[in-house]
Regions:
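Acyl-donor-binding surface of acyltransferase catalytic domains
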Residues: 1-37, 185
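C-terminal "cap" of GNAT-fold acetyltransferases
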Residues: 154-157, 174-210
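Conserved GNAT acetyl-CoA-binding A-motif
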Residues: 141-154
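Acetyl-CoA-dependent GNAT
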Residues: 49, 56-115, 121, 209
């Protein structure tokens, strides 16, 4: 299944967006992303053609990196779970060459405070992909006029909690194994996560490399 990040010469699937000024027709956050090692990826909305590649990412997801029972294990359980997310949620994927290496969703897509969940394949950890996926969803949800995003994270996952706090989430409830966090989606949040100009604006790209 071809899920390449972009088009161009053979073997060239990425262009550097650092000098792009954007257009009024760009999405809330630029899909082009350079990771911590200078490698280019694309983060874009999920498409039907991504089904097989996304299933493959989860089939190869290491069990020791699962948290709070997710992602599920086994082809049937993975497919059922993904069907629900695709049918009822708003989904984005991180594409590295011809592979999907990350996935984020918020469900339900029409809810005023939908729940966010993000997963990055273990071979692509420590590249900043999970954080960038979160920024995409935050920008998308804020632009859609949603009130807030919530998430649940294992209490012992201090690294993830630290990332979410850095993105503006606040702890609203903490139990023995589960921490609930919430992000208010006001205009200041949209300004911080947006990397394309609003209609009528002509600034350079804002936030690239954050």
């Amino acid at each position: 299944m071809d899920v390449t990040a972009g088009e161009g010469n053979e073997g060239d699937t990425f262009w550097d967006p650092s000098n792009c000024t954007g257009t009024p027709y760009c999405p809330p956050r630029c899909p082009r992303f350079v990771d911590k090692f200078g490698e280019g990826l694309v983060i874009r909305p999920y498409e039907e053609r991504d089904w097989d590649a996304l299933n493959e990412m989860y089939r190869d997801y290491a069990r020791e990196h699962r948290s709070m029972g997710l992602p599920p294990v086994g082809d049937v359980y993975i497919a059922d779970w993904l069907t629900g997310l695709v049918d009822h949620g708003r989904n984005f994927v991180a594409v590295d060459g011809d592979r999907i290496v990350g996935h984020i969703t918020y469900v339900p897509r029409e809810g005023p405070e939908p729940e966010l969940a993000v997963f990055v394949h273990q071979d692509s950890h420590n590249r900043g992909i999970g954080t960038e996926l979160c920024r995409h969803v935050i920008a998308d949800a804020a632009a859609a006029g949603l009130d807030a995003l919530i998430l649940h994270v294992a209490k012992e996952n201090r690294r993830a909690i630290h990332v979410y706090l850095g993105l503006g989430f606040e702890v609203v409830e903490s139990e023995s194994t589960d921490t609930k966090m919430r992000l208010d989606l006001d205009q200041s949040v949209l300004a911080k996560t947006r990397t394309t100009p609003d209609v009528g604006e002509r600034p350079g790209v804002r936030g690239v490399g954050q």
